[in-house]
Amino acid sequence: MEWDADDLLIEPTTEVENDYEDLCTQWVNERMAPDLLPFAEEIVSRVLDRIEAQRETLQLAIGTSSATSYRSVLMQTELERVKFVLRSYMRTRINKIDKYAQYIQSHPNLLLYLSSPERQYLLRHQQIVHRHYMDSFLREVPAKMNKLDDKVGNLSMVASPDMDTAVFCVVNESVEENFRVSENEYITLDKGDVLILRYSVISDYLRLGVVSLI
């Protein structure tokens, strides 16, 4: 029996499209937020499963067709687009872990935002950095001066994200009560509004999905 490649290619369902949109939202949020956001484990897991299933379907379709159909090429292109977003999302998180490793490690609540592989990466990263510093110069200085997390006054050796940086956001859900943005300033959050605010005042709403960064 001869199979038609087009018969093997399944059109994206609403659920699949929603997962891709959710992944894109997580990706943009992660890129625009100064700090590390909770890892989107459920979304990433579903997207990875569907990438693998689609890859197998495409291989079967191409293998059973005398010529690659135009439809399969489109599906391959779409697959690469999803993989690009996923890779960029993961790279963005790794870059933040590299930049704020000591800060993340010193805040147990932030460790909960990491996936299991990310926690392993952070631990290994810190071990390598500490060993490098010790071998390079820390062995030669007094013990009380070889810490990597010292703080003098308002100056800290530990790099931390700027939580007061300005960000653009879009409101996904209206909030009934007035929203405090400074000591004497309140605004309303209405669905569809696009605002520029200090990240620190909307970070909780971002994690709740009330707003998204743009």
Curated annotation (Swiss-Prot):
Q: Give the UniProt subcellular location, in the record's own words.
A: Nucleus
Instruction: Tell me the keywords, alphabetical order.
Output: Chromosome partition, DNA replication, Nucleus
Cellular component per GO?
cytosol; GINS complex; nucleus
Q: Which domain of life is it from?
A: Eukaryota
Q: Which GO terms describe its biological process?
A: chromosome segregation; DNA replication initiation; double-strand break repair via break-induced replication
Per the record's keyword annotation, is Isomerase included, yes or no?
Answer: no
Q: State the InterPro entries in the record.
A: GINS_A (IPR021151), GINS_bundle-like_dom_sf (IPR036224), GINS_Sld5 (IPR008591), SLD5_C (IPR031633), Sld5_GINS_A (IPR038749)
Write out the function statement from the record: The GINS complex plays an essential role in the initiation of DNA replication. Has a role in chromosome segregation and is required for bir1 localization.
UniProt lists the family membership as follows: Belongs to the GINS4/SLD5 family.
| Complex and partners | Component of the GINS complex which is a heterotetramer of sld5, psf1, psf2 and psf3. Interacts with sld5.
| Protein's UniProt name | DNA replication complex GINS protein sld5
